[in-house]
């Protein structure tokens, strides 16, 4: 068994560890069970989760067993981490639906067959907890003074932190304890914003079970300016093809800044590090070849080789003028009766933008093009004159294209 710790370290995933030497030794000697938590607040994972999926896959390839914990119980409270407002509570039915969607997406790069990975829902043990017993067994081990120093709570104290949310750390710590008892799970992994919650679980297991437990956080996927990657004009970059088409997904990675290519190749592809270094060393116009490889590899992981190939062909057709391949571009279909309406209305109706206000915002910023002409008029009406042989071409920014076909 290769030591996955060295792989994770070389590729730059690791941010913080509870016990560095012990963790390296453990991962090299034994096959362990570890877990990562997923908050089921949407019916699709997004690029922010993709990094966690990659870490799970690297660990599994090295012989360790991933446990994907879906927060069906904690999701009914909401995690205050990184939030300035309290989250909306969800129904059991919404959470269950989202859990099923997550498993399908995780299965793209994680093998759930023959117990090689499992998915569990913390609603199974949290929803039937006896409050008095929970306070006596778990609450007694948590210091309020210490909890208040955690970053996730500090930012909320000024605005007001409900007791409901204050319980989140206890529940996440209890999750780790339950997984340790049921599945001999000895390590929790998560984004660096989860550090305080992970420490709470590690400490709880050591106190309750007198056993060793470990925690590891990894870097968040940020660009060279320190901003989280995976945001587009239309919102989050989703892994669900119905929310973000494979073409849009491909184009996002094809258009990353030169300074971000090396980091993305390391963190979100399985390319060997020698190949990552070779591609990252390309300069000038040649860096575009590295971006094409990045876009293809990431799209292939999430949407499969066939969709990645289609997206690649569509992108090349657009810049090479090969109209017959434009069918792979995100395309919306409208009726002739939909013409003679405001462009912003049409864009919202075709779901090219989540709302009219988003479309107006981009027009104001000078980033929206209709048939390659910049749109400056908020009240532009789309008529038959705008319909070309290939349809109506919409461009957002420099390289994000959509097509509207009139039937």
Curated annotation (Swiss-Prot):
Chain ranges of the S4 RNA-binding domain: 341-405
Motif ('HIGH' region): 40-49
Top class in the EC scheme: ligase
EC number: 6.1.1.1
Motif ('KMSKS' region): 228-232
PANTHER family found in the cross-reference section: TYROSINE--TRNA LIGASE, MITOCHONDRIAL, TYROSYL-TRNA SYNTHETASE
Localization annotation: Cytoplasm
Complex formation: Homodimer.
InterPro entries per UniProt: aa-tRNA-synth_I_CS (IPR001412), aa-tRNA-synth_Ic (IPR002305), Rossmann-like_a/b/a_fold (IPR014729), S4_RNA-bd_sf (IPR036986), SYY-like_C (IPR054608), Tyr-tRNA-ligase (IPR002307), Tyr-tRNA-ligase_bac-type (IPR024088), Tyr-tRNA-ligase_bac_1 (IPR024107)
Substrates-to-products reaction catalysed: tRNA(Tyr) + L-tyrosine + ATP = L-tyrosyl-tRNA(Tyr) + AMP + diphosphate + H(+)
GO annotation, cellular component aspect: cytosol
Residues that, per the record, bind L-tyrosine: 35, 168, 172
Nucleotide-binding recorded as keyword: yes
Job of this protein: Catalyzes the attachment of tyrosine to tRNA(Tyr) in a two-step reaction: tyrosine is first activated by ATP to form Tyr-AMP and then transferred to the acceptor end of tRNA(Tyr).
Family recorded in the similarity comment: Belongs to the class-I aminoacyl-tRNA synthetase family. TyrS type 1 subfamily.
GO MF annotation list: ATP binding; RNA binding; tyrosine-tRNA ligase activity
GO biological process, alphabetically ordered: tyrosyl-tRNA aminoacylation
Amino-acid positions noted as binding ATP in the UniProt annotation, renumbered to this chain: 231
Keywords: Aminoacyl-tRNA synthetase, ATP-binding, Cytoplasm, Ligase, Nucleotide-binding, Protein biosynthesis, RNA-binding
One matching Pfam family: SYY_C-terminal
Main localization category: cytoplasm
Transmembrane parts of this sequence: none
Name this protein carries in UniProt: Tyrosine--tRNA ligase
């Amino acid at each position: 068994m290769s030591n996955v710790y060295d792989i994770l370290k070389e590729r730059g995933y690791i941010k913080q560890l509870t016990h560095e030497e012990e963790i390296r030794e453990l991962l090299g000697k034994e096959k362990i069970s570890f877990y990562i938590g997923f908050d089921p607040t949407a019916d699709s994972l997004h690029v922010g989760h993709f990094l966690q999926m990659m870490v799970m896959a690297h660990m599994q390839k090295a012989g360790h067993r991933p446990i994907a914990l879906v927060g069906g119980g904690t999701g009914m409270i909401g995690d205050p981490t990184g939030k300035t407002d309290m989250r909306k509570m969800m129904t059991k039915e919404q959470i269950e639906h989202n859990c099923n969607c997550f498993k399908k997406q995780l299965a793209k790069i994680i093998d759930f067959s023959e117990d090689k990975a499992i998915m569990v829902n913390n609603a199974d043990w949290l929803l039937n907890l006896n409050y008095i017993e929970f306070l006596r067994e778990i609450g007694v081990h948590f210091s309020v003074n210490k909890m208040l120093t955690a970053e996730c709570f500090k930012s909320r104290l000024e605005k007001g932190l409900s007791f409901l949310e204050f319980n989140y750390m206890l529940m996440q710590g209890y999750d780790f304890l339950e997984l340790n008892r049921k599945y001999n799970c000895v390590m929790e992994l998560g984004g660096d914003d989860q550090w305080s919650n992970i420490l709470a679980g590690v400490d709880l297991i050591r106190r309750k079970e007198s056993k060793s437990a470990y925690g590891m956080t990894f870097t968040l996927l940020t660009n060279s300016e320190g901003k989280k990657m995976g945001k587009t004009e239309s919102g989050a970059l989703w892994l669900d093809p119905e929310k973000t088409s494979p073409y849009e997904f491909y184009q996002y990675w094809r258009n990353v800044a030169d300074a971000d290519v090396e980091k993305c190749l390391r963190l979100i592809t399985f390319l060997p590090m020698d190949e990552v270094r070779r591609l990252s060393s390309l300069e000038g116009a040649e860096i575009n070849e590295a971006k094409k490889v990045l876009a293809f590899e990431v799209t292939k992981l999430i949407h499969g080789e066939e969709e990645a190939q289609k997206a690649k062909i569509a992108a090349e057709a657009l810049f090479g003028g090969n109209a017959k391949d434009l069918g792979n571009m995100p395309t919306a279909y409208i009726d002739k009766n939909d013409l003679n309406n405001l462009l912003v209305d049409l864009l919202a109706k075709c779901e090219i933008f989540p709302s009219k206000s988003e479309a107006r915002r981009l027009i104001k910023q000078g980033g929206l093009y209709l048939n390659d002409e910049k749109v400056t008029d908020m009240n532009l009406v789309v008529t038959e004159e705008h319909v070309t042989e290939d349809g109506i071409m919409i461009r957002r920014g420099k390289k994000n294209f959509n097509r509207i076909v009139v039937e």
